[in-house]
Amino acid sequence: NAVNSNLAYSPQFITNDYKRGVKILTHIENQLMHCDEFSISVAFINRSGFVELAETLKELERRGIRGRILTTDYLCFSEPYALDKLASLTNIQLKIYHVKDKNNGFHTKGYLFRENGIYRIIIGSANMTQTALSTNMEWNTQLVSTEQGEMAKSIVQEFERLWKDELSKSYDEFIEDYRKIYNRKKNQIGRAHV
């Protein structure tokens, strides 16, 4: 027997499908434009990912919608340019999780949006890169829950745990060290291809 449920609370599968004109980016932008606050935890952020979301994030800055973004130095993939641009937005707190142990990576991909006590959470494979948000084959699930829902509570608690972890460094505290590591790694890769 089928059980009727409120469609607004039904989970959604979200992917990119250029044939149908569907992008993960559209779902994320829509949630950003309707939320009271947001928290994002992604392993990788690059210039193209910031550019994809820039206008929406600037609109949220104008409206005073606060957000937190947690990324990482894992694999030195996140581009300092993109981090600089995110940190320049006055409504966003940015932290970088410092992976000290090479065997203990940081590979999260979660977008949490809160509006009037309701969470809409997108979790899956999409980093904050243009290809992940618009063209790659990515699989994500959007969950909708009240603040009291067990799944939402678990996800929010895990975000808070990572956000408060001593390895999560503020942008101001860690960006110069990260920039040096990133440039060193980029130079090593460049020399390897010569």
Predicted segments with their positions:
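PLD/PLD-like phosphodiesterase catalytic module centered on the HKD motif
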Residues: 1-191
